[in-house]
From Swiss-Prot:
Pyruvic acid (Ser): modified positions: S251
Organism: Polaromonas sp. (strain JS666 / ATCC BAA-500)
Entries under InterPro entries matching the protein: PS_Dcarbxylase, PSD-B, PSD_type1_pro
UniProt record, GO biological process: phosphatidylethanolamine biosynthetic process
Record-marked site positions (Cleavage (non-hydrolytic)): G250, S251
Cofactors that this protein relies on: pyruvate
Protein name per its UniProtKB record: Phosphatidylserine decarboxylase proenzyme
Membrane is among the record's keywords: yes
Subunit structure: Heterodimer of a large membrane-associated beta subunit and a small pyruvoyl-containing alpha subunit.
């Protein structure tokens, strides 16, 4: 009950308006003001700028430019594993999908069908499969990479709420990740289909993919979908470790994998910090 009480103010906040305003401000070029905002952000969240391809704070013209900064080559080596972590962040939850339900936090599950935008046929492909939910904090690197090789088959933008997605909110808001705005990316891989979902949150100005660019805004009320032929000559093909998208202000990634002999890294546990490229899982 205490967790639900702690998130009560989020139900009352004008989250859409706050997010639109934050996105507007973060995209403006304000010279020394922008530099000072970035400097304070780096100090508050202890961002490691030595890993950034551009370590000079003054080189970033906008806050979004800084927030989606690239890393230096080689600072995130790829592990020898079938699936690697697609982000820097922290493990929220991971495990099996049972009876169309995904574990969110103690006392909370949510529907796989709802998560993917109501597509029951798509959700059925992951019955008895596996999921992993990874949280990106403000200090983290905010580009998302591929956990394995994949060919894009479909992308869906699902409008929704914009609750915060931090651990406290995950424990206090039922069905959080299936309620928030999200971009659902469906890929074909040598091991079958998998889904990588970018979940929006309060202050997340937008989400973008490398093949489409900015997906949102616009923020309408209808689900939007784009189909891609994974076998076409011009198919979108991304290799393990390649960038697939980014958050313009942070959030959460949820991945779905079909039933099979998938074994997660034995070192993984909820709350553990992770880095892009580390071993996530292997097939037996």
């Amino acid at each position: 009950m205490s967790h639900r009480f702690s998130v009560l103010p989020q139900y009352l906040l004008p989250k859409q308006a706050l997010t639109a305003f934050a996105g507007f401000v973060a995209s403006r070029e304000r010279g020394w003001i922008t530099t000072e905002i970035i400097r304070r952000f780096v100090a508050k969240y202890q961002v490691n700028m030595e890993e950034a391809a551009r370590s000079d704070i003054a080189s970033y013209l906008t806050f979004n430019d800084f927030f989606t900064r690239a890393l230096k080559p080689g600072v995130r080596p790829l592990a020898d594993a079938d699936l690697i972590s697609p982000v820097d962040g922290a493990i929220s939850q991971f495990g099996r999908i049972e009876h169309d339900q995904i574990f969110q936090a103690k006392g909370h599950h949510y529907s796989t069908t709802a998560l993917v935008g109501g597509d029951a046929a798509l959700a059925a492909q992951f019955q008895n499969g596996s999921f992993a939910t990874l949280y990106l904090s403000p200090k983290d690197y905010h580009r998302i990479h591929m956990p394995c090789d994949g060919r894009l088959a479909r992308m869906v933008h699902v409008p929704g709420e914009l609750f915060s997605v931090n651990p406290v909110t995950a424990r206090g808001v039922p069905g959080l990740f299936a309620r928030n705005e999200r971009v659902v990316c469906v890929f074909d891989s040598p091991r079958g289909p998998f889904v990588l979902i970018l979940v929006g949150a309060t202050i997340v100005g937008s989400m973008a993919t490398v093949w489409h660019g900015v997906v949102n805004p616009p923020r309408g009320k209808q689900v939007r979908a784009w189909d891609y032929d994974p076998n076409a000559e011009a198919a979108v093909v991304l290799r393990r470790g390649e960038e697939m998208g980014r958050f313009l202000l942070g959030s959460t990634v949820v991945m779905l994998f079909p039933a099979g002999p998938l074994h997660f890294n034995p070192d993984w546990a909820p709350g553990r910090l992770i880095r892009l490229g580390e071993a996530m899982a292997n097939y037996a």
